[in-house]
Amino acid sequence: MIVLLSGAKKNIGDFLITERARRLFDYILDDQIIILDRFKNLESDIDLINSARFLVLCGGPAYARDIYKGIYPLVEDLTKIKVPIIPFGLGWCGKPSDPMQFSFNSDSKRLL
């Protein structure tokens, strides 16, 4: 089983990224795929997530200062997630004209 986190309810780009990830993993791994809402806290889904092969973060302007807890709330304690976390098609929220000014907050650095 694979768990995908999707923000597809917010925009079509996230839907397309999630759908492509679903098709790709279905084709390559022929495995059960579960799609969860990336906007919610996942405490109640932690057993499901930890029974998966891995957790995939699908789309969104996620490479942002607050990727963890802001863009992807996940769980309060990251050590509860025992499977690999894989980014797939994540966008960047920095300014192309000044990339050196971009940084992650301390919570996000723990996720990365």
PLM segments and residue spans:
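Aromatic- and Gly/Pro-rich donor/ligand-binding loops
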Residues: 1-112
